[in-house]
Amino acid sequence: FDCRAVNNPGKYERYKPFTGLDEPVITFLEEDGEITRFLDHVYEIVDASVKRYMDRGFTNLMICFGCTGGQHRSVYSAQHMAEHIHSKFGVRVDLVHREQNIEQLFNAIL
C-alpha cells in the first residue's frame, strides 16, 4: 500500500530523526487524521483477504507498505496493521521494518 498520499512528517526537520514508532511522529500523523482514514480503508481490504485466506487454509499472506523514505508513514502503517491483524484474528504476524532493521513477532493467540 502506497502511503505517499498521507501528509509526510519527514518534510519537517523536527521529525527527520524519528520513525513511525516514535511518539512525535505518531502524534503528528494521528492529529492530522489522514493516516486514520487511510488505514481504515486498508483494514477493510486486508480483513477480507485474511478471512478468505483462513477459510481456504492458506498460512502466508504478505502485506507491504511503502512511502518516500520508509521511515515515518509506512512504519506507522505496518506497525498498526500488524497489531490490528493480531488482535482481530489471533494469528501469528511477523513484522519487518526493513529500512530500520527491526523485526517483531506477534505469536498466535491460542
Language-model-detected regions and their locations in the chain:
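A structural preference for short, hydrophobic beta-strand core positions in alpha/beta folds
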Residues: 95-97
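C-terminal accessory "lid"/substrate-recognition subdomains
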Residues: 1-63, 86, 99-104, 110
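Post-Walker A helix-loop "phosphate-sensing" segment adjacent to the P-loop in P-loop NTPases
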Residues: 82-92
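Intrinsic disorder and flexible coil segments
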Residues: 68-69, 90, 109-110
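Catalytic cysteine-centered active loop of the rhodanese-like fold, especially the PTP/DSP P-loop
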Residues: 59-82
